[in-house]
A protein has these predicted regions:
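Short juxta-domain linker segments that transition from a proline/glycine-rich
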Residues: 1-352
Length: 352
């Protein structure tokens, strides 16, 4: 039966039953669509094909049997305007995760296993605790104090699925767990694919905090996760080495060089310098006023030296492997990657 998946795909597309009826040119009524979703009726092959086209999903998706559910869904910013918007985002997340797990099954590799780092979850009540927790995690993962070149790849190697989605300018990201009846839960971080690379990296570190910290809920917990992310991406020892332990002033040019080093925003670096008391409150105030004057404090946050978004490469590598080994057809590979078969062949034979 297709009920659950049909409802999920419709919700992900942001359509009501009446909207879908109109999209199908009234090929079937909203009442019939409702019965499909309640598994009281099964559409014929022609209607199934039309539903797939209207919803932008393959027929195989509607006919699939995976029983994934999302748990512990937490949006980084409490700015969802409606239940419809929230349901649409959750449906899109489930669809993306399902594709990921499907290709892992085809290749037979299984998910990279997430295991909690040594000593976690780290209990944090104060900002100093968040600083210590970031250092403990870096130590548990043998990261030293250097900048992490590709945080997305690093987290995927440790079993966290990273999925970019269009979330609109109000939402930076979210975290959740995908629960399946067979197999371990899969931790997931969703980042806004329209954000710059430096903003995505901070979101990843912020959402990682929710996976590894035991912290208060609400605004206090968000503040602690924010400090953890800052300390995890920009260790104090490295900043002290680069800029010293106390500065009367710092130029935008120097902040830009630090942005290139840490792959975080100029503004995040400035706040980190303030947190570590490398610069004082009046210096931070002057910098903040300059950020406002230059328009960096509001979308599109157009700082110089934008960092390219990191791309989750593991999913694509698995798709290429599966088609090369004959585990899936070219059409299935193209479907999973959202490409035409022609474009897939071009990428396989003539990569740029």
């Amino acid at each position: 039966m297709i009920g659950k998946r049909l409802q999920l795909a419709r919700t992900a597309a942001g359509m009501s039953l009446r909207d879908l009826e109109a999209k199908l040119d009234k090929m079937v009524s909203a009442q019939a669509l409702s019965k499909y979703e309640r598994d009281e009726m099964m559409p014929g092959s022609d209607v199934l094909a039309a539903l797939a086209r209207a919803l932008g999903v393959p027929e195989s998706y509607l006919l699939g049997q995976n029983d994934l559910t999302l748990e512990s869904v937490e949006f980084r910013k409490n700015l969802i305007t409606s239940r419809k918007e929230e349901a649409s985002i959750k449906a899109s997340v489930l669809s993306e995760v399902e594709r990921y797990l499907e290709i892992e099954d085809f290749v037979g590799v299984g998910s990279a296993s997430w295991s909690r780092p040594q000593g976690s979850p780290y209990r944090v009540e104060e900002l100093a605790d968040a600083e210590l927790a970031a250092g403990r995690l870096r130590s548990a993962w043998n990261l030293g104090s250097d900048s992490i070149p590709d945080l997305t790849e690093f987290l995927e190697e440790r079993g966290i699925k990273v999925i970019p989605l269009k979330l609109g300018e109000r939402i930076s990201g979210l975290m959740c767990l995908a629960h399946r009846s067979k197999g371990a839960d899969v931790p997931i971080v969703i980042v806004n694919q329209e954000d710059t690379g430096e903003r995505q990296r901070f979101t990843l570190a912020h959402e990682l905090a929710h996976h590894v910290l035991q912290a208060p809920e609400g605004a206090r917990g968000e503040k602690l996760a924010h400090r953890f992310a800052s300390a995890f991406l920009m260790p104090a020892e490295t900043l002290w080495r680069e800029v010293g332990k106390h500065r009367e002033s710092i130029s935008l040019g120097e902040l830009l060089e630090l942005k290139i080093l840490f792959k975080t925003s100029i503004q995040a670096i400035a706040y980190r310098l303030k947190d570590l008391e490398i610069i004082d409150a009046p210096t931070m105030k002057r910098l903040y006023e300059e950020f406002v004057r230059r328009g960096w404090r509001k979308p599109p946050y157009a700082e110089p030296g934008a960092i390219p978004p990191e791309k989750p490469e593991r999913f694509r590598r698995l798709c290429y492997r599966a088609v090369s080994e004959g585990a899936i057809s070219e059409s299935k590979c193209a479907e999973l990657l959202g490409l035409s078969v022609r474009e897939l062949n071009r990428r396989l034979e003539n990569p740029a």
